[in-house]
Amino acid sequence: MKNITDSFVSLGHWPFAGSFGFNTDILATNLINLSVVLGVLIFFGKGVLSDLLDNRRQRILSTIRNSEELRRGALEQLEKARARLRKVEMEADEYRVNGYSEIEREKMNLINATYENLERLENYKNETLHFEQQRAINQVRQRVFQQALQGALGTLNNCLNSELHFRTISANIGMLGAMKEITD
C-alpha cells in the first residue's frame, strides 16, 4: 500500500533539469491513448485490408487465368507445330535422296522456335505474377499507412480542445512559479 501512495505522491514531483529516470506514469506515457488508437486501427482497418486483399487476389487470379489462356494458345501452337513436323517428316521420307540434311535443319529450327516461344510465355507469366504481387503489397502498405495516419490525426483532433490547452498552460505556469519560489 505504501508503494501505491508513493507513486501518487511522485506524480506531483517533477525532476530538476539534467536528471532522467524511468517514467512509470501511465497517463504521461500515453499508453492508454496508443492502445485505443491501435485498437481502433485494428478494428476498422481489418475490413478494409481484407477488401483490398480480396480485390488484389481477384486481379492476380485473373492474371493467372490470362496467363493460362496464353499457355493454352502456346500449347495449341505446339500441337500445330507437331502436326507440321509430322508432315515434314513424311515429306522427308519422300525427299530423303534429295535433301535429308535440309529437312532435318528445318525440323530442328521449328522445334527450337516453338520451345523458345513457350519459354518466353512462361517467363512473361512469372514476371506478371511477381509484378502483381509486389504492386499488391505496396498498395496495401500505402493504404494501411494512410488509414493509420488519418485515424491518429482524427484522434488527436478530437482530444485537443481549448479547455485542455488552458488547463495545461495553467498547470505549467503554476509549476514554474513553484520552482521559482524554491530557487529564491
Curated annotation (Swiss-Prot):
Its main location: plastid. It is a single-pass membrane protein. One of its GO terms (cellular component) is chloroplast thylakoid membrane. It comes from the Eukaryota. One of its GO terms (molecular function) is proton-transporting ATP synthase activity, rotational mechanism. Keywords: ATP synthesis, CF(0), Chloroplast, Hydrogen ion transport, Ion transport, Membrane, Plastid, Thylakoid, Transmembrane, Transmembrane helix, Transport. It is found in: Plastid, Chloroplast thylakoid membrane. The chain crosses the membrane at residues 26-48. InterPro entries: ATP_synth_b/b'su_bac/chlpt. Disulfide bonds: none annotated. F(1)F(0) ATP synthase produces ATP from ADP in the presence of a proton or sodium gradient. F-type ATPases consist of two structural domains, F(1) containing the extramembraneous catalytic core and F(0) containing the membrane proton channel, linked together by a central stalk and a peripheral stalk. During catalysis, ATP synthesis in the catalytic domain of F(1) is coupled via a rotary mechanism of the central stalk subunits to proton translocation. F-type ATPases have 2 components, F(1) - the catalytic core - and F(0) - the membrane proton channel. F(1) has five subunits: alpha(3), beta(3), gamma(1), delta(1), epsilon(1). F(0) has four main subunits: a(1), b(1), b'(1) and c(10-14). The alpha and beta chains form an alternating ring which encloses part of the gamma chain. F(1) is attached to F(0) by a central stalk formed by the gamma and epsilon chains, while a peripheral stalk is formed by the delta, b and b' chains. In plastids the F-type ATPase is also known as CF(1)CF(0). Belongs to the ATPase B chain family. This is ATP synthase subunit b, chloroplastic.
